[in-house]
Amino acid sequence: GISGLALGIFLKENNFPCVIYERSSKISEYGAGISISPNGKDVLEKLNILEELKAISGNSKKTIFYSNLKEITSIDTDVLTTSRKNLYDLLLKKYSSLGGEILFGYELNDVDIGEKQIYFANGISHNVGHIAACDGIKSKCRQICFTSEMPEYSGYSVWRSILDQKQSNISFHLGPGFHIVSYPISKNKTSFVAAIKTKQKNEESWMLRGTYSDLSKDIPVEILNDYEALKNTQDIYKWGIYTRPKIKSLYSNHLTLFGDAAHPITPFIGQGGCMALEDVYEFSKILKSNDSQFLKTQKEYQSKRLKRIRFINKASMNQGKLNHINNPLLVFFRNFIMKNTNIVSLMTRKIWEYRA
């Protein structure tokens, strides 16, 4: 994923030997867009892939907020909106250009963090110097090393698709019990995401297919009519949003956690990918300054990241609640404050100004 490839690049650039083990037979991402705000773009610039990614992505300069199909307010933004596949492809290209090794078809079976031994489902095992767990929300590494912390359903599920439809700005539709965000990921394609508040759990998966008919039961057709391409695609997916209990540690013995393996968050402020990028840059920077002393690096990494992680997690959960307000009076006050104050710009600035 994002964190593994980005970490590999930073390690190779600093002459740290590393190898990436990938469960899948190839890197792929279906039906998924990603937004990268200035804090994440700063890391992409350090990876030397920002300009190349911008050239094939959407580069939205404005975000518009709607309620009941009426515009509430808009803000200027400097957000890179693209597909995960585009980002993955460039990260892989960069990592490979540095002589980086990646082994596909290596599904993790077990790990001994005391002996630093990794065991794979294909029968192969390797002894390593340190283990970087970048294996996502269903992290096998985390299950083995942090057995009491299992993913928990957040109460939200999300519909998403990539549409053959042009769009220049980022759009938010706020509604009772749901919200929609859409943004351009290239000149001719748009990412569509609709989040709903529901007690019905859905599997956390990129590949759980849904239908337009089911989507229209969760989201008003009047809003879906703005996205005509939804009616003509079979690539509509639905997945549940899962988080973990309050994060207390980012490492255990000779293993360190990154990205969703460390701190899966709800997607309501678009910081999942950015947080993964911040994680790996911070870790690699500290590792270099500590002359490869991993334990010292782990402690400093955790000290620097935990406060940020908890702030973003709380901000994202609160944003989800604001987006999905049902009470008409509270909706009125929310919209009034958004329209007549600079609260939206202030909140985004607080998140985006951070630099790892």
Please describe what each predicted stretch is.
Residues I2-E13, V19-Y21, A132-A133, D235-H324:
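Conserved mid-domain beta->alpha element of the FAD-binding
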Residues S3, K26, K138:
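Conserved Rossmann-like nucleotide-cofactor binding loop
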Residues T73-L92, H126, D164-K238:
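Conserved FAD/dinucleotide-binding core of flavoprotein oxidoreductases
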Residues K138-S139, V158-R160, F178-V181, A262-H263:
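Histidine-centered metal-chelating micro-motifs
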